Amino acid sequence: SILAHARGRAERCLILGVAALDGMRLGPFKAVLAHEYGHFSNRDTAGGEFALPVRRSLLTMGEGIARGGAATWYNPAWLFVNGFYRVFLRISQGASRLQEVLADRWAALSYGSRAFEEGLRHVVAREVRFGAHASATLDEVITAKRPLENLYSYKPERPPIERGVEVSVQEALEAKPSPYDSHPSPVDRFAWVRAMGAPGTGASAGDDAEAWSLFPDRDAIERAMTAVVRRNVAQANGIEIAGAAPPGRLDS
């Protein structure tokens, strides 16, 4: 509730992307988590419910004007809504970028500048790679009407072209900043944490272990998340994907 948020007693929920864990070392993983907990420590989530409703209201109002055919340069209502939305977005997103910088600082101080940069690079790259893998996999299983038990370990017959994926990863890492971005550009964030030169107070000898070593049953987690993906595809597109092949069917 709003009252619970104001009192700082609301329950916080941290969502961890399973695909990001693939190939991630424990040290960078801890640094990325420290970034998220940095938001909690700075109470960044306390006022998050205020900016988003304002943004949604402005968008709804603008869409209503546009659908009514009144989104013209001479309509003062449209000019006001459009202009106010842009100003509001610049201010609110600017505040969001500052929150990200301060959370980065917590992460670097806790586990080291190098660990956080490695973790952030990994997360950016995995978002691109997993997006390409998921698209290829879902296109294949939907077209061929195949079951999908584990999205993460599935090997599509036509995997994404590696060169194209590499280019996309590099573009994501070197993306130019915009005043409407909620996060600073990765390049800027790398430069800032490097300038700190923080060794990290929480680094330990076991930081080279795989992040997946923290979880006892990787396959069960991946299958559970695949079930969520299948359900979301069904709800959004009306396409049912089986979770397992029918008895006696051996094709993948």
Residue ranges and their predicted role:
Residues 1-49, 53:
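Peri-catalytic and regulatory segments of divalent metal-dependent proteins
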Residues 1-2, 12, 55, 60-63, ...:
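Membrane-proximal cytosolic interface modules of multi-pass membrane proteins
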Residues 26, 30, 53-62, 159-164:
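Noncatalytic linker/hinge segments flanking ATPase motor cores
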Residues 51-56, 124-126:
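Acidic helix-start/capping segments at beta-turn-to-alpha-helix junctions
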Residues 69-96, 101, 105, 109, ...:
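Cytosolic-facing loops and C-terminal tails of multi-pass membrane proteins
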